[in-house]
């Protein structure tokens, strides 16, 4: 008896504990939403989950119980049960009935609970359906507004699945009850089914046929989302064979179900067998066989003529899905010759060419500005600021706290003392010290500003590395930063976090984070607050799980000296007709939201950056208190929004094919582009400050070049504008197709083939240095192109500090390598004075440059001599011209 009680207690505890844990997480999540001010988001989501769960669960339970009620009321003379293929024994009717009823209720309850959980997972589809808007664009085949596909179809498909499952599960339950109670008897020659059972099953089969018919109807809509044709979406065979068949099946299936039900009702088994055979035959012929024959014998020989309307559909809707239809295409004649005057007139562009690559700069920042081992630079972000009155492109990296690198890891250190990172490192993208190191506008701890950028609130409590909770305003002083004379402490003064001073909250958070220390610590007082969801990516996802967030959050210094994170967010769908999907199935995407997180107090704000997006319109109706218009964003933050490079890369991958709007050109891939690669890695979009052709001033842009498919010359360059009032406008500048415009890979090959550069690289490698070749940047100036690539030197070991030692510049047929960008431009164009603030080469550097020129002259002379001996007088003459150019540069 005691043993049984102990087992019962264990079972009860095993059931209750997960429920209590979920309840604690639920309540502490509610406290998080109270802290952030988004309780309406929490309650709306909760109501949708509970409502959808109850709807599906209760509906299934009621349907099952009604059918079980009829099955339990039926009277049968006896209950026969067939066991082990031969033995048949009988049980009394009342004993079978007593067994069937509770088991049926239990099974229905279990199925209802599963339906509740499944239904709760459909909360987003429910909210989209109940708040849908009309888009105003119809699909070209069925004429439905695309809002039907985006907002209605997902829920309708879920309802169809639920209805089919409910009927099938109920049929199985009812069949089991009838079997136990004797309505179905298994004999050696088959099954004997009572007339009452047949009639009941006939009704269920008739209902099930309606769900199958609904499935065929929805499958017809789904053809526009399929990839069964040559081009994404419904093609000729889909529209003229499969769609017609599905329409026939939508009507035929209920009729077949009615005939099948009638056959069961009357016991006419032959009549009952014919309808499903007919439906299967129509499906096999109309969906599989006939379309395949149509494709092979009619479509394939005349594919372009027959598929042209459907190619137009996929072009149109793919461009709509990825916002490509707003890209403006502009011819770009790159045959104009640049002069020294052109370079001087584009001084702001030249001064903002990004020489510092992210990876070398991150390593350099880590070694120069990490200060202590427990600080870490996770990433380097690109932005632009008005620095001392000049529009300047900068690199910024937050100095976050790395708990993995704390010298002494214990609960008090990790949760009460070391609570935050401190400050930023901030400098221009193009300026280099004499030692080949970056210059700084803001550096050190406490922050030292060498420009008019001030950081007055440097503490970073919320960041990309802040993955654990901390407790602030405790009796233990928080560590702020180290100095030569000792550590400086601080006390949190922000509004972030949840009060944890009460015994109840201590107990709740101790349970949530599975540590008794929160409950027992004497350092936690009445004013203490617990900060959780501190990872900014996790924080925004907790509030808006229906959005996708960019993987590259970036930090901004506000005018008041505070630090803010800006995270790009995307609305998306996989339900846009005819739009080609990505690998994950998404075929509609917009960068419609900018999320801002305060690094000090964790406050969250979501701004709508694309009010024309239909998805964000619906989410705005669902969560009216979540979003604010872009006009509400403070000016000091709005001037730092930028077009996300990950989104432009995605758009570029699609635009490479879908810039072709002529179906014939698209079909033949006559003008297919691709993103150029250097090595195995495709080029990524990069930010730069430059003056667009025809514009009067420089602006902050995101740029990416294209090459023709399987060729290396340039075809176009794509740029997204980041500054107001032109934010979000994308331009595609196309090069003439009748002449060669060097592409990145061709320039890279010319660099590798340059004898002087290759010899210098070999020499550095032989001396134990690692040569790191930076990103190849294509810089449009006026109507010409400059190619710029920085070279970094670092010691071959892992601790090597990357130093920017050379800059390669290519223009036209010339490729030069110099210590600075200024010197490289002077070699090509001559006569340009270095702008104020740029680093001038020292006499030693000039001497080294002269020595390099001398070595280059000797190399050219040796090649000329060899060509003379071989009798190659044309090659000999070319080498003499090169030698003459080098001697002129030496004479400057």
UniProtKB/Swiss-Prot annotation:
Name of the protein in its database record: UPF0182 protein Gura_0902
Membrane topology: Multi-pass membrane protein
Transmembrane segments: 6-26, 50-70, 103-123, 158-178, 201-221, 248-268, 271-291
Compartments where located: Cell membrane
Domain of life from the UniProt record: Bacteria
Cellular component per GO, a single term: extracellular region
UniProt xrefs under PANTHER family: UPF0182 PROTEIN SLL1060
Family named by the database record: Belongs to the UPF0182 family.
Listed InterPro entries: UPF0182 (IPR005372)
Keywords carried by this UniProt record: Cell membrane, Membrane, Transmembrane, Transmembrane helix
